């Protein structure tokens, strides 16, 4: 029997296989590493090419495809947190006419300050005055005869006025963050304007203002338009963009009525919407502003317009005298101006509404805050045939019953107590005839004066908006009510308890 030959381990082909199995793990590991590197490379490359593709805009014109490459997005510059906007960095452009200058310059003098910058743009020259140092610089607007104007109800001066921001920009003033447009019959509260604009990044495109109080005005023009009389603000970069295209833009809208709708049309072409701030007031109303001012929104009061159309805001004085009176609380605590607080006199069942720096009103009976924060209709609509539904906000009647007619106390004087760190304002009853009331309850007519105490809070608007609380304090002073106004305490609610 033959034995099978022994299989030896050192056959040539076996040595080859052994070498193969020895090097295979190394080869496999190298391959995996190479593939991983290639995957990472192609992933990054594909991501970059995808991002580039996002900037490619494809359009088809007449059956022919055109490709345009948009520039890569530019990162937005961030505002410096240590650099707050100052009054010096706001430049005003004020629309005025030579015909009304001698009268309306008196309004501007009431709010203009020496450290401010701006220009009054006139349609023609006026004589120098001894009070020129109390006013902004005066300039004559550029020629607008080349622009078409064919609105039969308006006036072509609207074109001149619409170009004021652009003309002011071209003066080349340095360190400008905002341009603010206003009329010669607009009263500004400058410190509150600074507070409002400081909320926004001046390096971005901003168009800030508010709409009309008249629903019909907003329908006829636009709810998205800033009304120029109430004032509006345009950031510096947006003003530069506007100046580059405005003359072309104006030519496309010869049928528009005014200046502010022309600005709005150009803003629409620039793609910039209106940022609404409720403190800018066009006041397209007639009559008494008491109802509007005493129920001011929870926002800084920035402007009051149509001073010649409405009654003086304080009775028994002319308009200039009334605004001088308003400057008293503005100089003490402008942040709190016109801010409404509501509280209750429980023992006498009265509702008390305080509009700081302006009025105190006492009502017989208990009214909810929800009702009190609605303006009472002491004013008339811009369109004489329109009723209360013609307003662009909720309103309420002045009174629903003869016994609920408010007793109004207007600011007479105010001062600051350094020791107590609080303002003290005195309000005196406005003497008007009140109807006889047969209700068996305390009569507010016996209150002749109201004292209001409040600690100034310059950082009031650096916090989320909230209405202040007021409290009726006990007093032994005959014929006097004493009220404390301030930040609502923990768990404090405006309610009768």
Model-derived features with residue positions:
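N-terminal signal-anchor transmembrane helix specifying type II single-pass membrane topology
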Residues: 2-71
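C-terminal catalytic/acceptor-binding lobe
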Residues: 3, 26-44, 57-60, 255, ...
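Short, acidic, metal-binding catalytic loop of nucleotide-sugar glycosyltransferases
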Residues: 84-87, 107-118
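Active-site-proximal specificity loops/subdomain of glycosyltransferases
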Residues: 121-177, 191
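Short beta-strand-to-loop acidic/aromatic patch adjacent to the donor-nucleotide binding site
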Residues: 175-185
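A recurrent flexible, glycine/aromatic-enriched loop bordering the glycosyltransferase active site
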Residues: 178, 219-233
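Conserved donor-nucleotide/metal-binding helix-loop-beta segment in metal-dependent transferases, i.e.
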Residues: 188-219
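Conserved nucleotide-sugar donor-binding
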Residues: 189-190, 227-246
């Amino acid at each position: 029997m033959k034995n099978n030959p022994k299989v030896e381990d050192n056959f040539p082909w076996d040595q080859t296989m052994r070498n193969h199995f020895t090097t295979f793990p190394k080869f496999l590991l190298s391959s995996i590493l190479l593939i991983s590197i290639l995957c990472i490379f192609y992933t990054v490359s594909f991501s970059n090419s995808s991002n580039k593709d996002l900037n490619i805009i494809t359009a088809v014109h007449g059956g022919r495809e055109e490709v345009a490459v948009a520039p890569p997005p530019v990162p937005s510059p961030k505002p410096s947190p240590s650099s707050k906007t100052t009054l010096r960095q706001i430049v005003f452009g004020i629309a005025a006419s030579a015909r009304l200058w001698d009268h309306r310059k008196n309004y501007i003098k009431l709010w203009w300050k020496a450290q401010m910058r701006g220009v009054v743009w006139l349609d023609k020259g006026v004589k120098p005055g001894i009070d020129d140092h109390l006013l902004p610089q005066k300039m004559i607007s550029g020629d607008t005869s080349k622009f078409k104007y064919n609105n039969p109800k308006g006036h072509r001066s609207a074109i001149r006025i619409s170009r004021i921001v652009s003309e002011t920009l071209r003066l080349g003033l340095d360190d400008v963050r905002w341009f603010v447009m206003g009329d010669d019959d607009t009263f500004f509260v400058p410190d509150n304007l600074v507070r409002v604009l400081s909320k926004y990044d001046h390096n971005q495109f901003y168009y800030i203002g508010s709409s009309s109080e008249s629903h019909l005005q907003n329908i006829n023009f636009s709810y998205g338009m800033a009304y120029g009389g109430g004032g509006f603000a345009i950031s510096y970069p947006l003003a530069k963009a506007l100046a580059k295209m405005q003359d072309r833009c104006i030519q496309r809208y010869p049928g528009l009525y005014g200046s502010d709708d022309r600005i709005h049309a150009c803003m629409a072409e620039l793609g910039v919407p209106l940022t609404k701030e409720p403190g800018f007031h066009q006041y397209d109303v007639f009559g008494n502003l008491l109802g509007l001012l005493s129920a001011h929104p929870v926002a800084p009061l920035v402007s009051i317009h149509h001073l010649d159309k409405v009654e003086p805001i304080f009775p028994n004085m002319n308009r200039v005298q009334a605004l001088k009176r308003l400057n008293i609380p503005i100089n003490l605590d402008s942040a709190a101006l016109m801010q409404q607080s509501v509280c209750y006199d429980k023992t006498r069942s009265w509702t008390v509404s305080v509009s700081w720096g302006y009025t105190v009103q006492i009502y017989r009976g208990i009214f909810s805050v929800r009702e009190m924060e609605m303006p009472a209709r002491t004013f008339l609509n811009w369109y004489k045939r329109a009723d209360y539904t013609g307003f662009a906000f909720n309103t309420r009647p002045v009174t629903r019953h003869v016994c609920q007619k408010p007793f109004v106390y207007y600011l007479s004087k105010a001062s600051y107590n350094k020791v107590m760190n609080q303002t003290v304002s005195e309000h005196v009853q406005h003497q008007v005839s009140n109807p006889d009331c047969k209700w068996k309850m305390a009569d507010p007519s016996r209150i002749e004066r109201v004292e209001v105490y409040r600690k100034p809070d310059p950082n009031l608007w650096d916090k989320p908006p909230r209405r202040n609380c007021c409290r009726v304090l006990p007093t032994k002073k005959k014929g006097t009510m004493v009220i404390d106004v301030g930040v609502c305490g923990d768990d404090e609610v405006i309610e009768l308890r």
